[in-house]
UniProtKB/Swiss-Prot annotation:
Organism: Ailuropoda melanoleuca
Name recorded for this polypeptide: Growth hormone receptor
Annotated stretches, region: Disordered: 429-448
UniProt domain Fibronectin type-III: residue ranges: 151-254
Positions carrying Phosphotyrosine: 487, 595
Compositionally biased spans, kind Polar residues: 429-446
Record gene name: GHR
Native organism taxonomy: Eukaryota, Metazoa, Chordata, Craniata, Vertebrata
Signal sequence residues: 1-18
Residue spans, topological domain Extracellular: 19-264
Record's comment on post-translational modification: The soluble form (GHBP) is produced by phorbol ester-promoted proteolytic cleavage at the cell surface (shedding) by ADAM17/TACE. Shedding is inhibited by growth hormone (GH) binding to the receptor probably due to a conformational change in GHR rendering the receptor inaccessible to ADAM17.
Subcellular location(s) of the protein: Cell membrane
């Protein structure tokens, strides 16, 4: 429908001016141009078989040319059969007439060339094709819209560098702009596009457009040959011109061998596997040394442990075995002298020569004059010639906790005062009966001094003598025994052969010493002043011999009725029936050593003493001394 309308419009215009080419008004030309662009907007196929515009181009924005095709229905070529007419608008008005093409030869066959005299930029043009006076095709455009530059010329390349592997190389491609384009003066601005490919490939690789006339091409293989071409376009335009001639690039072979494939060192994989391997090695090291690393970072808390003691004994509650082990080692022995601080040590005065004639060493040791001395514990004794000091080589003992604990001095004070009163009473009676006491044999008293407490404290007497030899040092001054307690009850016998003595209890048998006859008191009081004690058989014989007149009274009223007494004897009744044997007892009495060597300060007034070595008696005097109980002693005493 539009085509018929166009033909009708052209027919009306042709009838108005048939000779001059039918000058049309601008309004009619504008409508015809719009109709032509809607019908045939650009070059393409010609389905109707009539002549048609193929393209219009300006290579440098100064001239342009248009090309068309012949119709298929024209069997005979007639130079004057197809004509091109154009019209342009100047000063906002269209020219009133159509003008024919100025040059049909310069641009080639079926073309019209417009030189610079007929070319104006920024001004629209309209062209039409006529055949035998009929318009067959029409087109309107502006010169800057149809610019398609000529191909660049003078392509060449330059080698930039070769890779270290000798496989790839970089080149620089250069060219010259089209010769007819006034690029130097800036009349036209061109953009260039470079394309390259390997010779045997069909797909071109395009690079980004550039404004310069040179561009680098990277990573070309040395063993390949490449084709390079360049084309251009006006800046901000979408239509490129023709491609330049193909440039062949043949890179020199620098490597001694031809590589078929590019060798890329797998640095990334090596780094990944290296990190993974190091991590695994670190984990294996930590796993194998985890206990040692744990001890270095978090050292274990040391378990409380006593050297030489098995911890299983403490867990099982075997405290007796632990105490035995502690008693064996000198470092863990209990310090018996730390409970009461009012007696620190015993001072032996070696400067006073008069004391040598006053009595034995035991008398001076047990006297009250040196009870609170402060120094010279280890001074050399004048009589014995030995050093009286603490010797750590004490025999191994087994003390319980109850044997070590000391009672308070306040509790022991009344009992001590009572003992002093009894001893004073005994001393008075001895003085009143001096004739009888002078003839009596020397009495023997225990030589161990300890503080009297609430409960009995065992005393260990260590020495090389056997357990059947009792320690009875001789006392020349009976009045020095006023403030001492005698330990005569054996509470235990250690495996080493030492006896542990406990203090006896005074005046618990129900007999007052002051009421006894003076003869008995003077002779037997020193030996039997304590109940709960062991008594030597020889001492019992002395008492029986000296005091026969009180035998019936002693049997009628027993003086030792204390319970819980463990007394041992071999043949006490036999001795009682043989008075002759009792008479010979004093003559067979063995010498008693003095205990002047201190082993342990066990309590405030308790000492562990060593017996002074004495010459061995004859074999006939080495009979053992039997121990008798108080009940048996009462039976045999007169």
């Amino acid at each position: 429908m539009d085509l018929w309308q166009l033909l009708l419009t052209l027919a009306v215009a042709g009838s108005g001016n048939a000779v001059s080419g039918s000058e049309a008004t601008p309004a009619i030309l504008g409508r015809a141009s719009q109709s032509l662009q809607r019908v045939n907007p650009g070059p393409g196929t010609n389905p109707s078989g009539k002549p048609q515009f193929t393209k219009c181009r300006s290579p440098e924005l100064e001239t342009f040319s248009c090309h068309w095709t012949e119709g298929v229905h024209h069997g005979v070529k007639n130079p004057g059969s197809i004509q091109l007419f154009y019209i342009r608008r100047s000063t906002q008005e269209w020219t009133p007439e159509w003008k024919e093409c100025p040059d049909y030869v310069s641009a080639g066959e079926n073309s019209c060339y417009f030189n610079s005299s007929y070319t104006s930029i920024w001004i629209p043009y309209c062209i039409k094709l006529t055949s035998n006076g009929d318009t067959v095709d029409q087109k309107c455009f502006s010169v800057e819209e149809i610019v398609q530059p000529d191909p660049p010329i003078g392509l060449n390349w330059t080698l930039l560098n070769i890779s270290l592997t000798g496989i790839h190389a970089d080149i620089q491609v250069r060219w010259e702009p089209p010769p007819n384009a006034d690029v130097q003066k800036g009349w036209i601005v061109l953009e260039y596009e470079l394309q390259y490919k390997e010779v045997n490939e069909s797909q071109w690789k395009m690079m980004d457009p550039v404004l310069s006339t040179s561009v680098p091409v990277y990573s070309l293989r040395l063993d390949k040959e490449y084709e390079v071409r360049v084309r251009s376009r006006q800046r901000n335009s979408e239509k490129y011109g023709e491609f330049s001639e193909v440039l062949y690039v043949a890179l020199p072979q620098m490597s001694p061998f031809a590589c078929e494939e590019d060798f890329q060192f797998p640095w990334f994989l090596i780094i990944i596997f290296g990190i993974f391997g190091l991590t695994m090695i670190l984990f294996l090291f930590i796993f194998s040394k985890q206990q040692r690393i744990k001890m270095l970072i978090l050292p274990p808390v040391p378990v409380p442990k006593i050297k030489g003691i098995d911890s299983d004994l403490l867990k099982e509650g075997k405290l007796e075995e632990v105490s035995t082990i502690l008693a064996i080692h000198d470092n863990y022995k209990p310090e018996f002298y730390n409970d009461d601080s009012w007696v620190e040590f015993i001072e032996l005065d070696i400067d006073d020569p008069d004391e040598k004639t006053e009595g034995s060493d035991t008398d001076r040791l047990l006297s009250n004059d040196h009870e609170k001395s402060l120094n010279i514990l280890g001074a050399k004794d004048d009589d014995s010639g030995r050093t009286s000091c603490y010797e750590p080589d004490i025999l191994e003992t087994d003390f319980n906790a109850s044997d070590v604990c000391d009672g308070t001095s306040e509790v022991a004070q009344p009992q001590r005062l009572k003992g002093e009163i009894d001893l004073l009473c005994l001393d008075q009676k001895n003085q009143s009966n001096s004739p009888s006491t002078d003839t009596a044999p020397n009495t023997q008293q225990p030589g161990v001094i300890l503080a009297k407490e609430n409960k009995p404290r065992p005393l260990l007497i260590s020495g090389t003598e056997s357990t059947h030899q009792a320690a009875h040092p001789q006392l020349s001054n009976p009045s020095s025994l006023a403030n001492i307690d005698f330990y005569a009850q054996v509470s235990d016998i250690t495996p080493a052969g030492s006896v542990v003595l406990s203090p006896g209890q005074k005046n618990k048998a129900g007999i007052a010493p002051c009421d006894m006859p003076p003869e008995v008191v003077s002779l037997c009081q020193a030996n039997f002043i304590m109940d709960n004690a062991y008594f030597c058989e020889a001492d019992a014989k002395k008492c029986i011999t000296v005091a026969p007149h009180v035998e019936a009274e002693s049997r009628g009223e027993p003086s030792f009725n204390q319970e819980d007494i463990y007394i041992t004897t071999e043949s006490l009744t036999t001795v009682a029936g043989q008075p002759g044997t009792a008479e010979r007892a004093p003559s067979s009495e063995i010498p008693v050593p003095d205990y002047t060597s201190i082993h342990i300060v066990q309590s405030p007034r308790g000492l562990v003493l060593n017996a002074t070595a004495l010459p061995l008696p004859d074999k006939e005097f080495l009979s053992s001394c039997g121990y008798v109980s108080t009940d048996q002693l009462n039976k045999i005493m007169p």
